[in-house]
A protein has these predicted regions:
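Conserved donor sugar-nucleotide recognition element shared by glycan-biosynthetic enzymes
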Residues: 149, 157, 187, 253, ...
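A short, amphipathic alpha-helix embedded in the catalytic core of nucleotide-handling enzymes
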Residues: 108, 164, 193-198, 225-229
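N-terminal Rossmann-like NAD(P)+-binding domain of SDR-like oxidoreductases, especially those catalyzing
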Residues: 1-180, 223, 300, 316
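Hydrophobic alpha-helix immediately C-terminal to the catalytic Tyr-X-X-X-Lys motif of short-chain
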Residues: 156, 160, 164, 194, ...
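C-terminal substrate-binding subdomain of Rossmann-fold SDR/epimerase-dehydratase oxidoreductases
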Residues: 16, 22, 60, 198-324
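Residues that scaffold the ATP/ADP-binding catalytic core of kinase and kinase-like folds
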Residues: 36, 131-132, 183-184, 207, ...
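A glycine/serine/threonine-rich, flexible loop-to-helix segment
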Residues: 135-136, 187-195
């Protein structure tokens, strides 16, 4: 039997595909290589996976019924990471985000129902908490006050997963990711964007006064959490859980800029701009539930994580012939 990873060519998806293949799993990767960012980056993300005979690559869109006809039937677990991501773009295009993240997820759930696939891990987001008054964020918070269309679509996805699980016997864990970073991070995300500007000698555009906080989670810790949740599902039939995966510590925006600049060996110039709509002031994960259910313990410090990211980032620039 195989694991189906949707969004397999993306940041988290490509790392997960490699991890599973390295551990001997049969993996099916579904991706539409959309133009949200450069598709050639996503192509490179799967270069190593394509070296494995146990990897089946399927090009298709989760909104397209024909994409599901291309998939093999021998699938027992789905890790659903395909989505339109990002808070600010969702404000500009709420209908597009609904179409991919809500309708696309519903079509995937229908596919699982038709084939009798028993287990699902759904990639959700810390953004569902909005500006939660309860810190750190706990899974039993209502999560009913999202402040962006993206957050609303992720909460809608969690609820649809619950409904399908109840009606059709799909066991599921919804994983609320907290600001994931590391090699292959999407180029539109802050750490990657700031690194690019720092390397080019440009000022960092900081929205707000720099005191907003994020719980940054290194990609390896996220992969450990996903795999822990997969094992938990295998031994826990009848499950529906919502679980935080975070670093369990916060870093201010201003401190993040300093850490990234230090890792790159440069001094930052900061241009202060007004705060942007849809951005939450703080994220902070209570990960005690993940630890209790499947032993999740984030281990990569922000200092070490930014060092690893900078090493990868500079290597990528060197390979592309970009220096300084």
């Amino acid at each position: 039997m195989s694991v189906l990873v949707t969004g397999a060519a993306g940041f988290i998806g490509s790392h997960l595909v490699e991890r599973l293949l390295d551990e001997g799993q049969e993996v099916v990767g579904l991706d539409n290589f959309d133009s949200f960012y450069d598709p050639s980056v996503k192509e490179r993300n799967l270069d190593r996976a394509r070296e494995f005979a146990r990897f089946t690559e399927v090009r298709g869109d989760i909104r397209d019924p024909e994409a599901y006809e291309k998939l093999p039937y021998e699938i027992d677990t789905v890790v659903h990471l395909a989505a339109l991501a990002g808070v600010r773009p969702s404000i500009r295009d709420p209908y597009g985000y609904f179409d991919v993240n809500v309708r696309g997820t519903l079509l995937l759930l229908d596919f699982m129902k038709e084939l009798g696939i028993p287990r699902l891990l759904f990639g959700s987001s810390s953004s569902v908490y909005g500006n939660s008054a309860t810190v750190p964020f706990r899974e039993d918070d209502a999560g009913d006050r999202p402040i962006s269309p993206y957050a609303a679509t992720k909460r809608a996805g969690e609820l649809m997963v619950h409904a399908h699980g109840h009606l059709y016997g799909i066991d599921a864990v919804c994983l609320r990711f907290f600001t994931v970073y590391g090699p292959r991070q999407r180029p539109d995300l802050a750490i990657h964007t700031f690194s690019r500007r720092l390397a080019e000698g440009l000022p960092i555009q900081m929205y707000g006064d720099g005191t907003s906080e994020r719980d940054y989670t290194y990609i390896d810790d996220i992969l450990d959490g996903i795999e822990g949740a997969m094992r938990y599902l295998e031994r826990s039939p009848g499950t529906y859980e919502i679980v935080n995966l975070g670093g369990a510590r916060t870093v201010t925006l201003r401190d993040m800029i300093v850490h990234v600049a230090t890792a790159l060996g440069v001094s930052p110039q900061i241009e202060v701009l007004c705060e942007q709509a849809g951005d939450v002031r703080r994220t902070f994960a209570d990960v005690s539930k993940a630890e209790r259910l499947f032993g999740y313990r984030p281990s990569v410090s922000f200092e070490e994580g930014t060092r690893r990211f900078a090493e990868w980032f500079l290597s990528e620039r060197a390979c592309a012939g970009v220096f300084g």
